[in-house]
């Protein structure tokens, strides 16, 4: 229990508060909400006013998104990769609203692949340490090189803009949450009901104008082993893009030639379950979070499109796993020769 207050205090990070609008239109609400007049117009008047035409945005786009929802996120991302089979083509092409939707759908498989690799590399460290245990008992703290937080290390390898990490660029859980834990492992995980949505909210001043954004919902259930204590940490991560209402504002966000796959998101985390040392701290964690959310600048090329896990594993092998195996093998040999 001595670590629990430190775990929770880390959730009180300082951020800018930006409330989610309560008046939302999603792709599933298309038959319930009237399409704003500005989005029903077609022809020269719509172009003159700077609005998307119906064929691009509004009712037609909502219908396209609704049709895509019959496919799994993996199938939608496969469509995206088929249309943009390499990074050069992706960087030189203009994305449509449907392209962005399919692109974001690839986040589920990227997360699965990343967390699977974290667990695999944790296993390599465990195998190396099982060759020989130089400590008496399990309470002696091992240095980072001999017991790395693999999720943290891979996040550092990927660098700024990679999602997810424990720190600023990913889940935006501050370092204080886990910095006091010397032994951190992901035992298992589940991603349930992953969703990508196109969300519209009516302009406060112009009621016939709708501002759109993409929303990604990631329910992430983590079973952790922290200092040999089981921790259940179930959270829902909500990510929202900036708003757009015209072709110009859409292009500013998603067809930026300078950094075509670097997009800003606003993230919010809800703790669904936090159990530690037989204590349910869920309510306290959410009280501390207070619906705060953060601005994240994420690089979707390395987070989704080109998640190069083999290179990460090779680097981890050279810097951590291989030296540790060699050290433990030598220590075992010396001990047996005594």
Swiss-Prot record:
A UniProt-annotated Pfam family: DUF240
Highest taxon of the lineage = Bacteria
Q: Which InterPro entries match?
A: DUF240
Q: Which family does it belong to?
A: Belongs to the MG032/MG096/MG288 family.
Protein name per its UniProtKB record: Uncharacterized protein MPN_039
Native organism:
Mycoplasma pneumoniae (strain ATCC 29342 / M129 / Subtype 1)
């Amino acid at each position: 229990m001595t670590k629990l207050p430190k775990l929770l205090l880390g959730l009180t990070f300082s951020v800018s508060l930006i409330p989610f609008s309560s008046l939302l239109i999603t792709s599933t609400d298309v038959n319930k909400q009237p399409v704003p007049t500005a989005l029903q117009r077609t022809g020269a008047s719509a172009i003159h006013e700077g609005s998307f035409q119906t064929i691009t945005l509004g009712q037609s786009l909502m219908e396209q998104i609704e049709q895509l929802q019959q496919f799994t996120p993996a199938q939608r991302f496969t469509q995206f990769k088929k249309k943009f089979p390499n990074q050069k083509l992706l960087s030189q092409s203009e994305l449509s609203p449907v392209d962005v939707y399919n692109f974001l759908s690839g986040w589920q498989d990227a997360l699965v692949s990343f967390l699977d690799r974290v667990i695999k590399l944790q296993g390599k460290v465990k195998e190396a340490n099982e060759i020989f245990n130089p400590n008496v008992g399990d309470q002696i703290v091992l240095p980072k090189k001999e017991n790395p937080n693999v999720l943290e290390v891979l996040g550092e390898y990927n660098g700024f803009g990679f999602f997810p990490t424990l720190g600023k660029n990913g889940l935006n859980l501050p370092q204080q949450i886990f910095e006091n834990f010397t032994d951190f492992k992901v035992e298992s995980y589940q991603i349930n009901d992953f969703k990508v949505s196109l969300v519209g909210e009516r302009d406060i001043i112009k009621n016939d104008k709708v501002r759109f954004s993409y929303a990604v919902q990631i329910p992430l259930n983590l079973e952790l082993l922290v200092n040999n204590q089981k921790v259940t940490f179930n959270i829902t991560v909500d990510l929202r893009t900036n708003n757009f209402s015209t072709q110009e504002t859409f292009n500013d966000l998603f067809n930026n030639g300078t950094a075509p796959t670097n997009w800003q998101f606003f993230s919010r985390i809800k703790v669904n379950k936090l159990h530690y040392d037989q204590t349910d701290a869920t309510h306290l964690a959410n009280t501390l979070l207070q619906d705060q959310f953060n601005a994240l600048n994420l690089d979707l090329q390395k987070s989704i499109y080109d998640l190069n896990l083999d290179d990460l594993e090779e680097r981890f092998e050279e810097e951590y796993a291989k030296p540790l195996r060699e050290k433990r093998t030598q220590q075992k040999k010396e001990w047996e020769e005594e």
